[in-house]
Amino acid sequence: MSLQVQPQVSLKPFNTFGVDVRAQLFAEAHSDADVREALAYASAHDVPLLVIGGGSNLLLTADIPALVLRMASRGIRVISDDGNRVVIEAEAGEPWHPFVQHTLAQGFSGLENLSLIPGTVGAAPMQNIGAYGVEIKDVFAGLTALDRQTGELRDFSLEECRFAYRDSVFKQQPGRWLILRVRFALNRVAHLHLEYGPVRQRLTEQGIEQPTPTDVSRAICSIRSEKLPDPAVLGNAGSFFKNPLVSAAVVAQIKAQHPDLVAYAQPDGQMKLAAGWLIERAGWKGFREADAGVHKLQALVLVNYGAATGLQLLDLAQRIQKDIAERFNVELEMEPNRY
């Protein structure tokens, strides 16, 4: 057996909140064979299997009575290249930001707006990660996943993934699909997305009038570094709440009290609000209780100042949800998966 299964392993190094809970069993998968072995092991020992990636979208509230399998497979390869459009495939365990930097170094554009997002390649399609006007669905060329119900491999097209805002079929059917590798359609001729004001502004400040994809990536990295704390320094899971979608009527109600509210019209007629703005306006920015808090610079980020438990962070999140619902009649949804 090549899979190394260890009992009673602390998951503190494997979640970016730095919450110290234990896995009943723990293993790392470096290949498809390891994944199948883990499935067989969990079945034979009658324990659940919980698959994790970089741990940047996890809130762990108790010890995990399961085999926790961390995807650690590596590998990046070009699948097709017609001179401009390049399809590149990466294994699920590849760290996301270094993968983005690799594609840029090869002269491929498309992922630059998704720079410095924590996590792994395999986790990216789960919630259709997005930033600065680009989502995974915009560069998606397919993926291969293992059906945990049948043990069969299946290739997914864009349509089959059912991507939506921070959502996908993989999130809608938790525990069924185990993503093994993902393919992206990138280009040598750049089509830059500079719709977001802060990105254009940063490039202008740097005196860059005709930016390259690498310039855009660097600008976004500098913006994100200023706004978001480094999980290696201060435990966090990035944006903790989704930006809520509400009706025009709700927007009108809030604007009556808060004329400076900014709302973004969506194709389906709904309006998207900035969750961070709502939380800050409600007075939570910089709040701290024991070691659980709201970041002092970015109200959308909950932080662990050292010894916060998952339950303390969850309690804080739920209090914020309750307050925002009562103040603004808006329901905030948590982004991290909770266990």
UniProtKB/Swiss-Prot annotation:
It comes from the Bacteria. InterPro entries: FAD-bd_PCMH, FAD-bd_PCMH-like_sf, FAD-bd_PCMH_sub1, FAD-bd_PCMH_sub2, MurB, MurB_C, MurB_C_sf, Oxid_FAD_bind_N. GO terms for biological process: cell division; cell wall organization; peptidoglycan biosynthetic process; regulation of cell shape. It is an enzyme of class 1 (oxidoreductase). Pathway: Cell wall biogenesis; peptidoglycan biosynthesis. GO terms for molecular function: FAD binding; UDP-N-acetylmuramate dehydrogenase activity. Its EC number is 1.3.1.98. It is found in: Cytoplasm. Its cofactor is FAD. Cell wall formation. This is UDP-N-acetylenolpyruvoylglucosamine reductase. The gene is murB.
